[in-house]
């Protein structure tokens, strides 16, 4: 096929502009990204060769070679991995295939460190070569294709690229960067080695360069015809923990997670017994941009006897731990393992159980830290992944209690929206006569804090958890108790805050009896809007509030389901009125404006709990009429 000139996808043009103009001060990342791509190409070859050994083409020793040419002002990264066909070169180098391109650009912050990290996260690291090069030439041939089907891809990064078919004997990919003016400091063995050792020391493939020695006569370093390996070139997880420094763990995390920030914590151990495997797990310090996308692929890198099998092996972790990054290397799984086999394998189930327990232990260590730095780390973790962890209460019955101990909430104990109260903290502060853990759900912390349902709790000094995450109502349908004590909504059913003395009981019964004509008339007036109307003693400042019956769906959950486009049964609440409030005291069952007051009390209660009025215009009209009648 003759040479073709093709245009980059629009997003690639935008990306190239970003690379060249925005990331210059962090230019070293180009080598990190290209070495990472070469390592991935070797992993892919190993995987495909499991079923077709001929793909090695009598060259099974995989490596990456790095070289430079001062005269030509080029840097070359060469690998003997899987390589690319013509179609693959066009697809991989001319477009951003991954969904989420818009999210990528929306995430760019102008912070060069953060933006540089996103490049790897989105799989567009190849283009980082244009930070230092004004032209890139790629020569490649896919393993298994004839030498006549080699491909040359070339671009100056200005909107288009050329693709040509060439003769290429060796499989794999050779990338040549033609450096921009002013980049000659990169044409140094010492400089390139230092970048590799900084970013890619942990890559399990040997990275080779020609040895250099000092020539006394010439007074300069000269290249020898002998290779040297410039990185550690061993799978970090196979080494003993005592041989790995914290810095090496952090670098390895940044490699596997495509993240520029350090992890919050990690755990590394070998498991022996029914299943034999090594696990190296990390807790990131921030959530990936697409954590809540439907097509988000969580999971760990899976190796079998150090042979890469797949990225994102979701079967090794439950969904609620999808943010955990790392590697599992099994000694028992077959090398030809597929995603389907992973679903059914008994060995995988055992690994999943072990990995889950280890991940939870790591989080427990973070959560139980006594020092300020440790406490700060758990706060960081919770703000990034707390809502995801809450899913575990419903998803993981076996570990529900462990997950519950890791949960954090805002509460009336503090005066901020910080979610820093553990359920164990709440239990430790419970009143002697208190038998339940109380909570309120709302759309916002402000709405929860000011909920009329809290009035009597404040009066009696009883702490209430303020729950404002969308997942909370769903979670609570699985979390019925903690430490043997039931969880109770302050907006559901009859309220029992401890025994009343005889005088209090008698006074409440008398008040209820006196209010009966008003209550009955209100029930008749509001009709289908309410399930019941009753006198309450849970309010101190507000005239009314809405509560759900014990077995009914709450108004908050109904609103949440509707917002998600799901069908929800109609919310028929119980209207509770405060007999001590002046507005309620002034109600007369035979008054001309009684109906308007009934609807106003209902609408006010609905608004106070974050609900939406069915007919706002009538509410305004009714309110104005009542204000005018009072003013008159």
Swiss-Prot record:
Residues 1-339 are annotated as: A. It comes from the Bacteria. Molecular chaperone. Has ATPase activity. Signal peptide: none annotated. NCBIfam families: PRK05218.1. Belongs to the heat shock protein 90 family. GO terms for molecular function: ATP binding; ATP hydrolysis activity; ATP-dependent protein folding chaperone; unfolded protein binding. Homodimer. This is Chaperone protein HtpG. Residues 340-559 are annotated as: B. HAMAP family: HSP90. It is found in: Cytoplasm. Keywords: ATP-binding, Chaperone, Cytoplasm, Nucleotide-binding, Stress response. GO terms for cellular component: cytoplasm. Residues 560-632 are annotated as: C.
